[in-house]
């Protein structure tokens, strides 16, 4: 797995051994970034703050930072082994000051000490019902801008849930996602 484009292009990302995480494939990230860079939804890769929840390897947040110009990317990941992988992947960017890792379950965050995010990636374990819970929590702690773009990766067998104050702008099937 590698960074596909931008200032960190071709840098190899570390991935965990075993199946505790399900890293987003290069194909999925490339398609997703093309959609986000296309202008149809503004230019969310240039948001001041990008949040990558259920961050796993950090690939989505790092790819977004590679292509855009955020002031900060925050990874939220409760698994300590995954956090170690994210730390290694941040080191390869040589831009440590751009990234921050919160080693905590999103549901445990009670206050948000950062500015509001314009782009959020949600990539929870499949069939966990965590997308809806994460959206509610992010809104509750006031972590997202009213017009933030939320990108959620779910299994094609999971139903899209329409959540109050959120609407689906775009949906695309890629492999099993």
Residue ranges and their predicted role:
Residues 1-177:
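Class I S-adenosyl-L-methionine-dependent methyltransferase catalytic core
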């Amino acid at each position: 797995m590698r960074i596909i484009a931008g200032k960190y292009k071709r840098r190899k990302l570390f991935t965990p051994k075993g199946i505790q995480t399900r890293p987003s494939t290069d194909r999925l990230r490339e398609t997703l970034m093309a959609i986000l860079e296309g202008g149809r939804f503004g230019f969310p890769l240039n948001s001041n703050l990008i949040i990558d929840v259920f961050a796993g390897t950090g690939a989505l947040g790092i790819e977004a930072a590679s292509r855009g110009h955020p002031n900060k990317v925050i990874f939220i990941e409760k698994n300590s082994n995954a956090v170690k992988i994210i730390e290694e992947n941040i080191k390869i960017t040589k831009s440590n000051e751009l990234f921050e890792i919160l080693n905590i379950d999103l549901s445990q965050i009670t206050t948000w000490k950062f500015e509001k995010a314009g782009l959020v990636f949600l990539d929870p374990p499949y069939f966990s019902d965590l997308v809806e819970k994460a959206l509610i929590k992010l809104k509750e702690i006031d972590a997202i801008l009213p017009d933030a773009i939320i990108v959620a990766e779910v299994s094609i067998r999971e139903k899209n849930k329409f959540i109050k104050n959120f609407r689906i702008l775009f949906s695309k099937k890629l492999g099993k996602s």
